From Swiss-Prot:
Residues 1-19 form the signal peptide. The gene is dsbC. GO terms for cellular component: periplasmic space. CDD domains: DsbA_DsbC_DsbG. Its main location: periplasm. Required for disulfide bond formation in some periplasmic proteins. Acts by transferring its disulfide bond to other proteins and is reduced in the process. This is Probable thiol:disulfide interchange protein DsbC. It comes from Bordetella avium (strain 197N).
């Protein structure tokens, strides 16, 4: 058996580790190469269980050892809401806390935060598992809240959460501009600043929201002031429920998601794959 090296990034675990702003760059695996995926992070509150459930992930009952790990973890961190707990092939136990993944031993004598990298395959195991746990049924997304734009026949569908002031979202817009045969559903998610809320309202209240959004994101032409009953609160609540922790966040028809700007080739592959499967 090939030896495998597990790379762990240590992190302090605190009770209120769900409030931070800023920019981040994380590494994703694609076709055997490392692609840098950029996103603007805004960590929201953990999703509640109220309302419609969008996750398609089914959790199996834990075995006695895993159940004991959960109980020990909860005993040591009584103020945290624990999600999925399960063993890994690497001799560790994976513990989901909101949108983060932590690792511990069977005695919960130490806790470390991912990402966990499989050195043999160079896969980001943490990212893969979080994507599975955060799977969202595309057909259940409330697309009536989104700005719909059809390019070509619109065969490929994608839903995107964007902040109007997100630089990486603008970069993604330029990538999508070069693509055809795609239907884009944009959920405006104003989380970066009060001005983001104003711009989101102005876009949503415009006569042609898609045209105004592109003018701002692609050309830097700010939307004209507009007033209406824009569903800002509903959009923010939706993003929190779906654990959208940064912009842009992309949702595909195969119920997977991606955080950040994907390289053009990888984005095309994801769109094509979703239709063929």
């Amino acid at each position: 058996m090939k030896a495998r090296i597990i790379v762990l990034l240590a992190s302090l675990l605190c009770a209120n580790a769900y409030a931070q702003n800023g920019y981040s760059a994380s590494t994703a695996q694609s076709s055997g190469q490392n692609d840098t995926v950029y996103s603007t992070n805004q960590v929201g509150k953990p999703a509640t269980n109220g309302g419609k459930v969008y996750s398609t992930t089914q959790v199996q009952p834990p075995d006695p050892v895993t159940d004991a790990v959960r109980k020990r973890f909860q005993l040591r961190f009584q103020d945290l809401k624990i999600g999925v707990v399960r063993p890994t092939p690497y001799g560790l136990f994976e513990v989901q806390l909101g949108g983060d993944m932590f690792y511990t031993d069977k005695d919960v004598s130490w806790v470390m935060k991912g990402p966990l990298i499989d050195a043999a395959t160079r896969r980001d195991v943490t990212r893969e598992n979080l994507e599975k746990l955060s799977a969202v049924s595309f057909s259940e997304l409330p697309l009536d809240l989104a700005i719909k734009q059809v390019k070509g026949q619109g065969k490929h569908r994608i839903a995107i959460f964007e902040d109007p002031n997100c630089g990486y979202c603008k970069q993604l817009r330029h990538t999508l501009k070069e693509m055809d045969d795609v239907t884009i559903y944009t959920f405006l998610y104003p989380i970066l600043s009060p001005d983001s809320t104003v711009k989101a309202r102005d876009v949503l209240c415009a006569a042609d929201p898609g045209k105004v959004l592109d003018a701002w994101m692609l050309e830097g032409k700010p939307p004209a002031p507009a007033h209406c009953r824009a569903p800002i609160e509903e959009l923010v609540a939706l993003g929190e429920k779906l654990r959208v922790r940064g912009t842009p966040t992309l949702f595909f028809e195969d119920n997977t998601r991606a955080a950040g700007v994907l390289p053009p080739a990888q984005l095309r592959e994801r769109l094509t794959r979703n239709v063929s499967q």
